[in-house]
């Protein structure tokens, strides 16, 4: 093909894209924008991964809103390849915990290399996962590797990991803004989650997130976030 080739000819058989006015945009003054941004940063700066949960009930609507917020994430070709499964049934949570602890015990005993053990040591983790039954909710995030169309054929999804990662971030932010806490738990391996929750072969478990209120005596590791100069650069080029 030459440089003059019109690539739009390749989709000429499809109807033209449909566009609508940008919905819901609300202009703000620079002062209001700065105040909102600073408040959001302050709220998120208080976020900590938490393993000590209260058993206090959390309304289902809050969990639903967090998942719906996650569903507003951008995605490759707008495929929206995320699927959330929310569980508050004590029997199912106990089943998930037993399966997770069985896998984690194998990991801590023999699968985990020394470098990984040393990296996890400051977090004080082990194979006991009480948070899975203490927290009132468990939300499992699955990535849809490919879609299944009405005729049973596969539909390719694009940038699945990136899209699902963004959705996870929005979910975590929503939980934080509600005054709840969560933990991004990644049992290794995670195939048991798909099997126990009856998900399709086209889905892959990405995160298991207990959600709830922190326990009255909740503690977190004494860790520090990287300073701005370590994670941000301005106008840097190789030239």
Regions found by a protein language model. Name each.
Residues 18-26, 41-56:
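Generic N-terminal amphipathic, Lys/Arg-enriched alpha-helix
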Residues 59:
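Conserved, non-catalytic sequence blocks in retroelement Pol enzymes and Pol-derived host proteins
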Residues 67-70, 139, 145-196:
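Small-aliphatic-rich amphipathic alpha-helix that forms the alpha element of a beta-alpha
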């Amino acid at each position: 093909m030459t440089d003059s080739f019109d690539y739009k000819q390749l989709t000429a058989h499809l109807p033209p894209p449909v566009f609508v006015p940008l919905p819901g945009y609300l202009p703000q003054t620079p002062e209001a924008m700065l105040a909102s941004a600073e408040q959001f940063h302050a709220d998120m700066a208080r976020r900590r991964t938490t393993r000590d949960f209260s058993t206090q009930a959390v309304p289902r609507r809050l969990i639903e809103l967090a998942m719906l917020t996650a569903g507003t994430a951008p995605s490759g070709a707008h495929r929206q390849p995320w699927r959330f499964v929310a569980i508050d049934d004590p029997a199912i949570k106990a089943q998930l915990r037993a399966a997770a602890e069985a896998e984690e015990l194998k990991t801590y005993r023999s699968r985990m290399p020394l470098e990984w053990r040393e990296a996890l040591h400051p977090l004080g983790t082990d194979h006991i996962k009480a948070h899975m039954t203490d927290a009132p909710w468990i939300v499992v995030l699955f990535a849809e590797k490919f879609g299944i169309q009405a005729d049973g054929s596969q539909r390719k999804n694009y940038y699945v990991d990136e899209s699902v990662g963004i959705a996870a971030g929005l979910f975590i932010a929503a939980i934080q803004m509600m005054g709840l806490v969560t933990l991004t738990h990644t049992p290794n391996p995670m195939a048991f989650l798909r099997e126990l929750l009856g998900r399709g072969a086209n889905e892959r478990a990405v995160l298991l997130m207990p959600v709830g209120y922190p326990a009255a005596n909740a503690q977190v590791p004494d860790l520090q976030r990287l300073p701005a100069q370590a994670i941000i650069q301005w106008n840097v080029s190789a030239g």
